[in-house]
Amino acid sequence: MREILLIGLGGFFGAILRYLVSGIIPVKFGIPTGTLIVNLLGSFIIGFLIYSSLFGSLSTEYRLFIITGFCGALTTFSTFSYESFTMLEHNYYLKTGLNILLNVFGCLGMVYLGRLASMFFW
């Protein structure tokens, strides 16, 4: 039961941050920038914490709270997919491709940067 509460509490804060970021950051160049930012941020945090746990200790409770709960609610593949599909429906092919490339490769890059940052941290 404790694990579920930790995930739920982390998810509560991650969902609120996602809502705030998506509401504050406007669409730029026809790309849903808020979704991109939360996906990049969440990917960096996950990369940093996963690789930090290789060099230091990260308790199961922190992993559940931050990685599963917070980052799980912060990042959103379903919203990214819906926004990309909607862009395709409106025939924004170039912007859709750019959105997909930025999200996929940007998030992969952020996991890598998080990994590098964790090496310097520990």
UniProtKB/Swiss-Prot annotation:
Annotated residues that bind Na(+) are located at 72, 75
- Note the topology in the membrane: Multi-pass membrane protein
> Which GO molecular function, any one, fits this protein according to its record?
metal ion binding
Provide a GO biological process annotation.
cellular detoxification of fluoride
Please give the catalytic activity noted in the UniProt record.
Answer: fluoride(in) = fluoride(out)
Chain ranges passing through the membrane: 4-24, 36-56, 65-85, 100-120
**GO CC term (a single one):** plasma membrane
Q: Which UniProt keywords apply?
A: Cell membrane, Ion channel, Ion transport, Membrane, Metal-binding, Sodium, Transmembrane, Transmembrane helix, Transport
Relay the activity regulation note.
Na(+) is not transported, but it plays an essential structural role and its presence is essential for fluoride channel function.
Location(s), subcellular? Cell membrane
* InterPro entries per record: FluC
This molecule's function is given as:
Fluoride-specific ion channel. Important for reducing fluoride concentration in the cell, thus reducing its toxicity.
Q: Which family does it belong to?
A: Belongs to the fluoride channel Fluc/FEX (TC 1.A.43) family.
Q: What is this protein called?
A: Fluoride-specific ion channel FluC
Which species expresses this protein natively?
Methanococcus maripaludis (strain DSM 14266 / JCM 13030 / NBRC 101832 / S2 / LL)
Classification of source organism: Archaea, Methanobacteriati, Methanobacteriota, Methanomada group, Methanococci
Q: What is the primary gene name for this protein?
A: fluC
